[in-house]
């Protein structure tokens, strides 16, 4: 009887464990949403890239600390290093620029900080003129002082979405949550639209458009309805592309940004408009990071009649020295920073070698979007 009871208890425990595991919420895959359709680029003869196996898109989220002039001096040194790599190895960057990082150039009371941030803008302009691309990035609503300045210069008429409601949310340290759930749809669109116009003005002198956005926190909502709201906001702000669909819970084992090569491009139907998604290539730590172990040769394996796009993600601010980090003891040592610089340059060497072997074709997001749209 005692043996039978133990057996019954064990069976009951297994049943409870099975029921519990089945009842856990499965992370939604945005690439499976009905309004998201995977896009596959067909190989075309007679193009500069026709003989290559894959496109290579190197992106970085430009979100430095800009609390003091010395912070700015440090990130400017990092930008100079990044620019030197690009020029030396002929591999351009696509910078997703956090517009709020440039705001002090226009709203800071500290004149030294203001002038220093003006210099960052000059650096980014020079890099854009040397073949780099600059697109929009935000982690929260656009700086309120900057937004008011921009509104006085050019008033936009923005839509308001009905049926806005709060709900359980998978991760709250993100642009989408802070802008949409914190302030509403109209403020979400306002940050996007004015942020887009701001970068077009200060980086491109209003001669080129900023077409793409990458959301801070890699977040586009808790479910398919949120994601559709998100893409509606991008469209209403005049943006035509996004880079950063993600699956799972931020920081958890199920966290994944983007998708595998050949599956990370998509079109998104938003009413009568069509948006383009160019997601990162998934990899260790959620996405392909140029300083973490990876095999670009394997990732670029030939897909018959298809030109896959490998999208890497880096954060140049990770090489920055800041007063705040020094004070709280979180600043990485000079040796650690130098080691990371060496890893980044080694990545550039590898890509250059694969380019010479006609495996990878380096490209910016702006150039890729032009190819996708047939321009």
Model-inferred region functions:
Residues 1-10:
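Bacterial N-terminal signal peptides that target proteins for export
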Residues 30-130, 308-313, 319, 351-359:
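Active-site beta->alpha N-cap acidic-glycine motif
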Residues 33-45, 158-160, 204-322:
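Active-site-adjacent pocket scaffolds in enzyme catalytic domains
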Residues 20-21:
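C-terminal motif of bacterial Sec signal peptides marking the signal peptidase cleavage site
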Residues 69-70, 97, 104-109, 145-149, ...:
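A short acidic (Asp/Glu
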Residues 71-82, 110-122, 185-195, 225-233, ...:
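Well-ordered, non-membrane alpha-helical segments in soluble/globular domains
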Residues 92, 96-224, 248-251, 311-316:
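Metal-dependent polysaccharide deacetylase catalytic core of the NodB/CE4 family, i.e.
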Residues 269-290, 308-375:
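Active-site and substrate-binding clefts of carbohydrate-active enzymes
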């Amino acid at each position: 009887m005692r043996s039978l009871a133990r057996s019954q208890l064990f069976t009951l425990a297994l049943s409870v464990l099975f029921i519990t595991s089945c009842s856990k919420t499965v992370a939604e895959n945005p690439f499976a949403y009905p309004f998201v359709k995977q896009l596959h680029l067909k190989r075309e003869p007679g193009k500069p890239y026709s003989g290559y196996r894959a496109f290579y898109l190197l992106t970085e989220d430009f979100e430095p600390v800009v609390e003091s002039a010395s912070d700015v001096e440090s990130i400017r040194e990092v930008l100079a290093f990044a620019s030197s790599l690009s020029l030396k190895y002929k591999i351009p960057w696509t910078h997703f620029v956090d517009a709020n990082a440039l705001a002090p150039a226009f709203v800071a009371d500290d004149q030294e900080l203001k002038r220093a941030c003006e210099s960052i803008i000059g650096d980014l302009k020079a890099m854009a003129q040397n073949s780099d691309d600059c697109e929009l990035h935000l982690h929260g609503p656009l700086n309120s002082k900057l937004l008011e300045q921009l509104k006085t210069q050019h008033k936009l008429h923005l839509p308001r979405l009905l049926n806005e409601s709060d709900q359980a949310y998978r991760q709250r340290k993100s642009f989408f949550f802070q802008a949409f759930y914190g302030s509403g749809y109209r403020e979400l669109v306002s940050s996007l639209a004015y942020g887009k116009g701001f970068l077009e003005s200060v980086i491109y002198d209003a001669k080129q458009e900023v077409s793409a956005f990458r959301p801070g926190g890699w977040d586009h909502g808790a479910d398919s309805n949120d994601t559709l709201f998100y893409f509606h906001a991008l469209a209403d702000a005049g943006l035509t592309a996004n880079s950063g669909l993600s699956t799972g819970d931020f920081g958890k084992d199920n966290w994944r940004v983007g998708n595998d090569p050949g599956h990370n491009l998509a079109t998104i139907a938003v009413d009568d408009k069509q948006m383009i998604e160019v997601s990162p290539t998934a990899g260790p730590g959620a996405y392909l990071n140029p300083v973490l172990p990876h095999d670009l040769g394997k990732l670029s394996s030939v897909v018959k009649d298809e030109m896959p796009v490998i999208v890497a993600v880096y954060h140049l601010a990770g090489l920055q020295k800041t007063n705040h980090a020094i004070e709280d003891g979180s600043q990485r040592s000079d040796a650690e920073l130098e080691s990371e610089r060496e890893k980044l340059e080694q990545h550039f060497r590898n890509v250059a070698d694969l380019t010479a072997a006609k495996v990878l074709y380096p490209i910016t997001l702006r150039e890729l979007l032009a190819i996708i749209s047939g321009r």
